[in-house]
Each structure stands twice: as structure tokens, then as C-alpha cells.
Amino acid sequence: MSNINVIDILKESDALLEGHFLLSSGRHSNRYCQCAKLLQCPQKSEKVISVIAEKLKEVDFNIIVGPAMGGVIVSYELARQTNKPGIFAERKEGVMCIRRGFEIKKGDKVIISEDVVTTGKSSLEVAKVIEEMGGEVVGIACIVDRRAEDVKTNYPIYSACKLEIETYEKDNCELCKKNIPFVKPGSREQK
């Protein structure tokens, strides 16, 4: 599996975008990774997610939870490859929760699956729900880890690749200063 070049597959899938983007975190960036473009291709997704599955071989877990939207397909494919159950969390009235008959049992060891981790906000929201239900989060699995060095999640990250993409506060964004309109590609509602 080590001969898989995840960045090349992301590029082939048109998942790495250039422009001016308002991220779901509220920060701005000149690059964006739209993993939905990768995830629409099952064969490419299978290859990329196999890199994560390989990293999870030595991790003790029994269930995978993916936050909607980006983590749903990742959860499914990772569950398929690791032969573990895969479920998803979703927002109800703006609050992340486990619904649809899914459950986390006391003592479950959980991997949270994501497409992209930037600030870890969605993962941490899901972790809180899992822990309130009696589960233990043992890691976060993602296709792309694009966290800045100062962003900590308190959980190990198992990613298919690491991308260093600069982000900016609105007030420090050169693209805003040039009046270049932004695109809001993320799935979380902006306030």
C-alpha cells in the first residue's frame, strides 16, 4: 500500500482547488481540498482510504463514527476495509448527535473519521457526544490532515496525507484586501 501517492490521486480527482475560500472554521485560504470530488470515485476512494486502514491495523478500536457530511463516506469505506461497524453523527438543530438507531455503548473504542481536519472542531464535537455516551475516542482518521502546527486535538491523527495550506483570519487575508470574492465550499453553516 505504501506506493499509493495520495496527493496525485487528489489532483487527478480535481479535489485540490485554487482560489479564495471561506472555510467552515471561519478562516480564509487560497487553497481548498474538496474531498467530495475524490469520494465520488469509489475506486480512487478505496485506494486513498486503504492508506488510513493500514495505519489503523495496530490501533485497538471497535467502531467508526463519521460526522456528516464529510465523514459519512469515509466512515463507510474505512469500516468496510477494517471489518468494523461504521456509523455517522449529524446535526439536529445545530447540535451534533448520534441518531437513526445508531448507538455508542459504554466502553466502545471509537475512531472518528473525517475527510479533512483543519481545526478539529467537528471531530471534537463528535468526541464530546461519544464520551457522553460512554465511549472512548482512540483517534481521528482522515484523508487530509491540514492542521496548522498549533492546532491540537488531544487525539492521535491517522491521515492518508498531510497538506500544509495556509489560512488567514479575515482581517489578515490578502485576497480580501484585493477585493477578490470568496467561495464557501464547506458543509458547516456559517454564522
Curated annotation (Swiss-Prot):
It comes from the Bacteria. 5-phospho-alpha-D-ribose 1-diphosphate binds at E114, D115, V116, V117, T118, T119, G120, K121, S122. CDD domains: PRTases_typeI. One of its GO terms (biological process) is pyrimidine nucleobase biosynthetic process. Belongs to the purine/pyrimidine phosphoribosyltransferase family. PyrE subfamily. Homodimer. This is Orotate phosphoribosyltransferase. It comes from Clostridium botulinum (strain Langeland / NCTC 10281 / Type F).
